Every structure is written in structure tokens, then in C-alpha cells.
A protein has these predicted regions:
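Sec-dependent bacterial lipoprotein signal peptides
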Residues: 1-19
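Short glycine-/small-residue-rich flexible loop motifs, especially phosphate/cofactor-binding loops
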Residues: 9, 65, 112
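C-terminal/domain-edge helix-coil "capping" segments
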Residues: 22-25, 70-72, 132-172
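Extracytoplasmic/periplasmic, Sec-exported soluble proteins
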Residues: 52-56, 60, 105-107, 145-156
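Bimodal feature
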Residues: 63, 121-122, 161
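Surface-exposed short loop/turn segments
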Residues: 71, 76-147
Length: 172
């Protein structure tokens, strides 16, 4: 009987420790001023020219603002502010070898989303590094070294924006 009582007491203790505090409710619409952008690139191409990091940042800002507006998630007078940090990494074929290529291999994304009210972080999400999947034909194009323009990167930006906005919509 003592063992059962001790076991029951232990289980109740562990259940009590595992419960979390209730989260403060969000306003549902957010104030958004723009992203914090970091561009990572370990190789500077000389044969092909790609869009500048400033252009990539502008595209992210424009598309995120458009998607948030479309989803009716923006309110400039909201008490909740949306802070988004994006790290966009370009990978070039062979960049880690002696046989570097100026053809783009892929795009990687890491992002953080915070909802802040009066300086207090109410929600925080941080992704691991995500690789853009251009599909079967896009991967084949990369394998044969045909990614020498901005099309791969523009598709990656659009897909990444969708991922970020879906994360924001999922924050409750």
C-alpha cells in the first residue's frame, strides 16, 4: 500500500512539473516594419551575375508584406509587433572544393519569428537550416549545371516566404 501511495505521489509530482504556464493571447494582427536580413555566400562568381543581396532582401520584404496583407495579418496600430530574422545562404556548385563553379547549387534558409509586445517576447519560433527543393526537374537542372540566372533563387524566395507566413499563421 505504501509503494502504491509513493508511486502515485511521484506520478503526480512529475505531471505537475511538466505542465506549462498558459501563453498570453495574441492580438491576431501584427505591426510589421521589415525583416532583419543576413546574406551568406562563400564564393564570388565571375562568369555569371546574380541579383545583389540588397535585391534579395527587398524581394523578401515585398513578398512577406504582400502575403501578410493577403492573409489579413497586418495592423499598424497593433500592440503585437512581428520581428522576422532571415539568413539566406547561396551555395555554388563545388564551392567547398578546388573546382569551384559560378553556377548556383542551391538556396538555404534559416529564420526566426518573434511576436513582441511592449518589449516582451510572447512567441518565438526558430527554424533549422532548410534547403529549397526545386523539384525533380529543378534538381536535374542543378546536376547538369544550368542554374546560372536568378530563376532558382526567385523560386526559393517565394517558397521561403510561404514557409515563414505559414509559421506566423500557426502561432496562436
Amino acid at each position: 500500500m505504501k509503494r502504491i501511495f509513493a508511486l502515485l505521489l511521484g506520478v503526480l509530482f512529475l505531471v505537475g512539473c511538466s505542465s506549462s504556464q498558459p501563453k498570453a493571447p495574441l492580438a491576431g494582427k501584427y505591426k510589421f516594419e521589415g525583416i532583419s536580413y543576413t546574406h551568406v555566400q562563400h564564393h564570388e562568381p565571375t562568369k555569371f551575375f546574380y541579383q545583389s543581396p540588397k535585391m534579395v532582401e527587398k524581394k523578401y520584404n515585398k513578398q512577406i508584406l504582400g502575403a501578410l496583407t493577403k492573409e489579413n495579418l497586418l495592423d499598424p496600430n497593433s500592440s503585437d509587433e512581428l520581428k522576422i530574422k532571415i539568413t539566406h545562404r547561396r551555395e555554388f556548385i563545388g564551392e567547398a572544393t578546388f573546382a569551384k563553379s559560378d553556377r548556383m547549387g542551391n538556396i538555404y534558409l534559416t529564420y526566426e519569428v518573434e511576436v513582441v509586445r511592449n518589449g516582451e517576447v510572447l512567441r518565438h519560433y526558430s527554424s533549422s537550416e532548410l534547403r529549397f527543393n526545386p523539384g525533380v526537374f529543378g534538381n536535374l537542372k542543378g546536376l547538369v549545371g544550368q542554374n546560372n540566372d536568378d530563376s532558382l533563387e526567385n523560386k526559393a524566395i517565394s517558397a521561403n516566404v510561404k514557409e515563414i507566413v505559414d509559421t506566423i499563421k500557426g502561432m496562436k
